[in-house]
Amino acid sequence: ADPDPQVYINFKGEDKEKREAMKFLLGAFLTALMFMALVLITQFNSIYQALLVLSAIVFSTTGVLLGLLITAQPFGIVMVGLGIIALGGIVVNNNIVLIDTFNRMRKKGLNSIDAALETGRRRLRPVFLTAFTTVLGLMPMVLAMNIDFVSRNISFGAPSTQWWTQLASAIAGGLTFATLLTLVLTPCLLVM
């Protein structure tokens, strides 16, 4: 049955705080994207290359969702939002390195296909190792590991790790997915 039209329902408390946090994080994310776009356009003198870098951030959110799914973590607006924003900086850095190397190869006279192949060859190890060590470093948080150095005890699932597990899962999943995209998709799109 429908409630009486004179009845007014207003959600407060945690729901209101989540909405405010989501609004703030969305504003921060869009502002960061705008500033990144301005810096990238001036750095590369190319709107296409700047959009290519920024598209990696959007694509990496798929990896964030996959990371949460694999680790069976709930979607928490605050920690996942912070994870996406933090991930944006890492993904942008990897793509800037690739595009800068590609542009230097083009200035040396290589055609676009050879420049993309050489870029992939030169930057595979640094990009992969950076991502691998970051994901490996996040694994204790992803696994909700709690280490007590005094009693030499390792436990899993401590309440203090609840928030960090979502954040670490978001960054680890997104970075893994984004690294694969960076190493495969970015050079392909640069050739176009």
Region annotations inferred by a language model:
Residues 152-160:
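Surface-exposed acidic, glycine/proline-enriched linker/cap segments
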Residues 163, 167-168:
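Structured binding elements
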